[in-house]
Amino acid sequence: MFIQWGRRFFALFWLLISVILFSSYAYAEQGDKEAGKKIYEVRCLWCHGATGEGNGFAAQFTNVRPRDFTMGVFKFKRSLPGQIAADEDLFRTISNGLPGTPMPSWKLVLSDKEIWNVIEYIKSFTDIFESDKASGMVDYKGEIPYSADSVNKGREAFKKAKCYECHGENGRGNGMKKLRDDWDNREWPRNLAKPWTFRGGNDVKDIFTRVTVGIPGTQMPSFASANGLTEKERWDVANYVRSLVDETKRPVSPQTVLRAKYIKATLPNDVNAAEWNETPSAAFKLFPQLIENDKLRGFRPTNDSVTARVLFNEKEIAFLIEWDDRTKSVPGDPIVEKLSEGEVFEDAIAIQLRVGPPTAVQQPYPGHGDKTLGVEMWYWGTGNTSGGQTIKMIDANGLGTEKRRDAGRINIKGTGEYKAGIWKVILRRSLTTSNTHDDFQFERDVLIPVTFANWDGSNGEKASQHTLTNMHWLQLEP
């Protein structure tokens, strides 16, 4: 009897310890508002503003507007649909941050107690927490394990709920709807192929939560209503969404070298040729180009990465550059003009190479080079409805010094295709040219500095207002 009781005691004891140590759920604590105010004024005021209206000085430069606390509406929560956010929801957001936004993770800077103090102060910006309280949380007991069967059922439920109208048939966010949130900010549907950009978490439970609760203040509704999806269907949709991940779009570390593959055959002209599938790829994160005066204000890039593959033979080199883009931006196209906030420019991509000996390892400034180290850029654009695709060759020694050269004279060729929310563009040229002074000469087994620049024309991007990668290394196989 004593032995049985002892076993039960220790089993319960270790169960309790496991819950305490490994649970990701934070239980609410009563914070100190005055202590939270002091932290807020040092850490949070610059974006969220002195009165919590999301209008701090830095807000004008952010790609996603800071939360307006005075409305009491919080996007990412586990409290039930129609209920206000629970304190635990605010704790989770402050602790983990929101990927793809200026909201950082604070858990390595602030203690749990300090975060609870900040929450208590944030809640004082509205009286909604005085009269209301979350009374229930999303229940995960009915979770359906990930399987091919669940994914297939989720695909059908995705269609049933018409998720494709915003997220697109393949989940790339290219549903061609013009969306605005409750603060009248332009919103773009989430690209479901990039779960690392999901702001409220990206495991199956997190996705189930978003489908169940929705995202308050946005066009993303709750599908838990009577005419929405059943609990089982929502779990299947969550598994289906998780299956859409495209790992070739996940940005690599800055130290990653882009490897160019050698083939004896003629280089492919088709962006979907089988040779590209057998070529190493690397995805690079895009950053806003720093531009002068007040142009940076309100510039909120929509494309966040490019993926590159490179093939070469004895005579030529070819780059296949791929990126997800919610719109095919062609000036003069009435469909994309309805989606845009202003004038539509061409979608475009450019490769930037340093001018000079291939064996030199100095890196020029990623944005159009600098006075010391010049660059050449191979530019491809969509053109407009009355003309063909644009191909340019540009030399530069810094912003404002660009000089265009005839791309045809050095035999730069390009072609592009847009399909299901994805651009694929090939740019190619001979490995060497007769103009060794002005043209970059490719050599094998050396590190070559390379940068990629991207323009989303429906987002008002043109000239120096665009995104670009950091400088990375390209190496042709020895």
Q: What is the meaning of each model-derived region?
A:
Residues 306, 315-318, 324-331, 358, ...:
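Primarily extracytoplasmic ectodomains and periplasmic/lumenal surface modules that are beta-strand-rich
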Residues 30-49, 146-172, 179-184, 237:
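Sequence/structural segment immediately N-terminal to covalent heme-attachment motifs in c-type
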Residues 11-22:
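Bacterial N-terminal signal peptides
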Residues 257-289, 334-419, 462-465, 470-477:
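Extracellular/luminal beta-rich ligand-recognition
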